[in-house]
Amino acid sequence: MEAKMNLHVCALALLLFGSIATVRGRAVDLVDDSNDVDNSIEAEEEKPRNRAFEADWLKFTKTPPTKLQQADGATIEIVCEMMGSQVPSIQWVVGHLPRSELDDLDSNQVAEEAPSAIVRVRSSHIIDHVLSEARTYTCVGRTGSKTIYASTVVHPPRSSRLTPEKTYPGAQKPRIIYTEKTHLDLMGSNIQLPCRVHARPRAEITWLNNENKEIVQGHRHRVLANGDLLISEIKWEDMGNYKCIARNVVGKDTADTFVYPVLNEED
């Protein structure tokens, strides 16, 4: 019970901090800054399963804008952030789907088995071609029995010299499109910190540890083939900021994840 209380207190503190902190999104062309409407939707909650938490929970910490206007030749990045129990997953749906289909949509990601975790995850969708028509992009988040989602309608350029729907030519700098901002879990747990990248040519990924030193493969720290960082049996000394760095010939991008090991009072 004390372990659950520790995790919930940490989560509430992080949510409060996130709600008052100024979050700066990446620049996209002609964002509709006048729109302050909450466009998120939360599905009906099912009966929770018997796990370390009394119920699943999932909340947006950053919802995508309701609409964007694409400029000729501009790459757009739509950002979505949420925080919840276990390890929430985010996927993007292109095109309009009714609520019933969004609720029943099968996730294209393998759920990470982490019943004691509390995680804040960030995902972005890249549009690197000229749209031919207005299109809806929906950020769908899940954890356990909870599903939430929010949509953005992107309008095409008013006039374009480029061929619609054709990917922009040439190399593209890396953009980290899937990462975790914060990861809390009980000491002794194995955690996997994602770092998924959109780049052309393919980006090389390195990680810096909580002492700002490059991580060398070892028995407790491993960089996986997909760029994720696996930390086995986390300890109190693992607490701190971990940085993913993605590089290619065009440039680089970075993303930080704060790891917080929580004492399990039941041990």
Swiss-Prot record:
Single GO molecular function: cell-cell adhesion mediator activity
Entry annotated with the keyword Secreted: yes
Cysteine disulfide links: C80-C139, C195-C244
Gene3D superfamilies associated with the record: Immunoglobulins
Single GO biological process annotation from the record: positive regulation of entry into reproductive diapause
InterPro entries for the chain: Ig-like_dom, Ig-like_dom_sf, Ig-like_fold, Ig_I-set, Ig_sub, Ig_sub2, Neural/epithelial_adhesion
GO cellular component: axon; extracellular space; plasma membrane
UniProt keyword Disulfide bond present: yes
Any Pfam family the entry gives: I-set
Keyword annotations: Cell adhesion, Developmental protein, Disulfide bond, Immunoglobulin domain, Repeat, Secreted, Signal
Major site of localization recorded for this protein: secreted
Induction per the UniProt record: By 20-hydroxyecdysone.
Tissues where the protein occurs: Detected in several sites including the ventral neuroectoderm, the tracheal pits, the pharynx and esophagus, and specific neuronal cell bodies, where it is primarily expressed.
Signal peptide coordinates: 1-25
Record function comment: Essential developmental role during embryogenesis, in particular the normal development of the nervous system. May be involved in some aspect of cell adhesion.
Protein name as catalogued: Neural/ectodermal development factor IMP-L2
UniProt source species: Drosophila melanogaster (Fruit fly)
Organism ancestry: Eukaryota, Metazoa, Ecdysozoa, Arthropoda, Hexapoda
